From Swiss-Prot:
GO terms for molecular function: GTP binding; GTPase activity; guanosine tetraphosphate binding; translation elongation factor activity. InterPro entries: EFG_II, EFG_III, EFG_III/V, EFG_IV, EFG_V, EFG_V-like, EFTu-like_2, G_TR_CS. Keywords: Cytoplasm, Elongation factor, GTP-binding, Nucleotide-binding, Protein biosynthesis. GO terms for biological process: ribosome disassembly. GO terms for cellular component: cytoplasm. It comes from Bordetella avium (strain 197N). GTP binds at residues 17-24, 88-92, 142-145. Catalyzes the GTP-dependent ribosomal translocation step during translation elongation. During this step, the ribosome changes from the pre-translocational (PRE) to the post-translocational (POST) state as the newly formed A-site-bound peptidyl-tRNA and P-site-bound deacylated tRNA move to the P and E sites, respectively. Catalyzes the coordinated movement of the two tRNA molecules, the mRNA and conformational changes in the ribosome. It comes from the Bacteria. This is Elongation factor G 1. The lineage of its organism: Bacteria, Pseudomonadati, Pseudomonadota, Betaproteobacteria, Burkholderiales.
Amino acid sequence: MARKTPIERYRNIGISAHIDAGKTTTTERILFYTGVNHKIGEVHDGAATMDWMEQEQERGITITSAATTAFWRGMAGNFPEHRINIIDTPGHVDFTIEVERSMRVLDGACMVYCAVGGVQPQSETVWRQANKYGVPRLAFVNKMDRTGANFFKVYEQLRTRLRANPVPIVIPIGAEDTFTGVIDLVKMKAIIWDEASQGTKFEYADIPAELQASAEEWREKLVEAAAESSEELMNKYLETGTLEEAEINAAIRQRTIAGEIHPMLCGTAFKNKGVQRMLDAVIEYLPSPIDIPPVDGTDDDGNEVQRRADDSEKFSALAFKLMSDPFVGQLTFVRVYSGVLKSGDTVYNPIKGKKERIGRILQMHANNREEIKEVLAGDIAAVVGLKDVTTGETLCDIDAHVTLERMEFPEPVISQAVEPKSKADQEKMGLALSRLAQEDPSFRVRSDEESGQTIISGMGELHLEILVDRMKREFGVEANVGKPQVAYRETIRKTCDEVEGKFVKQSGGRGQYGHVVLKVEPLAPGGGYEFVDAIKGGVVPREYIPAVDKGIQETLPAGILAGYPVVDVKVTLFFGSYHDVDSNENAFKMAGSMAFKEGMRKASPVLLEPMMAVEVETPEDYAGGVMGDLSSRRGMVQGMDDMVGGGKIIKAEVPLAEMFGYATNLRSLTQGRATYTMEFKHYSEAPKNVADEVIAARGK
C-alpha cells in the first residue's frame, strides 16, 4: 500500500510540561484545529479527549501518554498535508517514567510553560530527559491571558535555569486581559485570531505602532540566529542586513534539529490563541523521521547495527507502552523505526527470544480508534494480542534480528503492603497486579516471605494510590493498603580481606563439602554487585564457581542488619578446598552464602536511605516557615530562586522517610498556597539513630 503521506511530512512529537501549565488543554486545541475534535474538550469539566482514564478526568491530571494521530495543512492552508503523531506526556513527577519512555520514541517535542509560573521544577526534569535522548524541541508559553503573565521573563528563565537557547518566532501583543494576539517575527505581521470561530479563522494585520521598535529588535535576534547556520547566510546578512523568509525558516529548522536553538512561541490555549501558529512551527522546524540519525541497535552477536526510517528496510520497532483496554484487551504501543508491520505478521522479540503474532493494528485518536492493515516506517500505532512483550522491548523481522537500545527504568523508592478485602479477590488481585506491573516497569510486586503479605513498590505515594485505584476500577478488586514503607538498602563501608565459609556434613554415606575464602569490599554508589573469580590452581573446581556466585546472590535480597537488599558490593573468590566425593554445587552455594554473611558483619555494614530532591513553590511570606519545616525533616536546603509571577522556589534534599504526609503539612503551613514536587535523587547512609530505629522495628 502506497503511503498517503510521504515520510518527510511525518512529525512524531511529544507535548510535555509541568503540571498545570495547561498541556492537556493545549493538546485538545491541537486536536480541535486539526479537525479531529469538533467540540473542544475542557479539562475544567473533566471531558478532555486525551485524558481517557477515569482517574485522570477526576483528578484533572494526565497520567498515561495516549498517542494520537492528527493532520495539519497550516493555519492558512499553505502546507501540503502533514501527519502529526502526538504523544501526551504526564507532568506529575511520580510519572516521570511515562515521560522518559515517550521521549525515547519521539523525534521532536513541544515544551509547554505557564506564562505566570515559568520554568517550574518538573520542567527541569523533563528538559533533562529530552537532553538525554537528544530530542529537538520548541517552547510554547501558555496562559498569556492570566494575571502576572510575562513572556520575556520566561524567556530569561529558559536561558538561565535550563541553559536553553530560546529564539522567539513570535512575541505577544499585550498580556493578561489585554493579550490579543502575536506578532509573527518571520513575516513581521500581527496575527489576530477570530474569537467567534474559536480561533479557526485569523487575519494578518499591521504591527501596532507602540510595538514596532520591540518587534524590530526581536526580529533582528531571529535573523541573526538564522544567519549563524552557515557562513554563506552570515555573509549575505552582513552585506544586505536581512534574509528572505524561506532562508530564515530553513536555517531555523536546521539549527533546531541540530539542538542548537529552541524556537519559542506563545498564546493562550484556553482562549484559542497561539496554538495554531505553534502547530505551523512544528511543521516548519521539528524533524521528520528521516531528518534524524538512524536508530542504533545490536545484532545477535552483539555487533552494532543501524536501521534507517525506510519501508524497504527490514522491520524493527520498539514497544514503548502497554495498556489494558476494556474493549480489546492488552494494547501495545509501538514506534516502527524501519520496514513495515502488517496485521497477521509473525515477528521476533530478541529480549525474550520468542516469536509473536501480530493481531489487529489500531491507530489511536485519544480514546477513539481506527483499525488499519499496516504501519509504515516512522509511524506509531497500537497492536492487539501480543502475548509476552514488556515496555522497552524490541520487535523485529524473524530473519534479521536486532535489539534496539533498552530503556532505563528507575528503582522504586516506596512500598506498601496490599491485602484483598475478601477471599474472592485474592486470585483477581494477583492477576491485576501482574498486568499493572507489565504495563509500568517502575511498579514492582513481590511477596514478603516472612509475613506472606503482597508488597507493591513504586515511585511515590500518588503513583501507588493511582495503581490501587486502577485495580478497583479496571479489575474490580477491593484492597486494603498498609502504611507506606521506605525502600531502605544495606551496604558495607570497609573491606574484609579474608572471610571463610565452610559447609560440611559428613556422617556416613554421601556427605556435603564446600569450602570457600572470599574478599568482600564496597563499591561506589550505583555499583550494584560484582563477583570476581580469582581461583588459581583449581583449589575450587571450575564447575562449582557459579554455585558460589549464586549462593551470594541469593543472600543479597535480605541483608544482615534489617533484611533489606544489599547493594554496591564486590566479592572476590580467591581460595577454598573441595572433597572428591562429598563436594557438590549445593555445598558450595551454602559455603558462599555463609562466607558472604560473615564478611558483611566484619565490613562495617550500614543502612542506606533514599534521599529525595524536593522543590517547593511558595508565596514569599511563607518561605521562612517552609525552610524551617524542611530542616526539621532532616532536610538540607540547597537554594532558593525567584518565580516569574512572584514567590519563591525552595530546593532541598530530604530523606523520603521524613516526607510522608508532607502534602497535608505544607497545605496547613501555607494556607494551601504552596505546591511541591519530589523525585528520587540517590541513596545515602542513614544517621545512626535513624538506622537503630529501623533495625529495631524490623526485629520485632
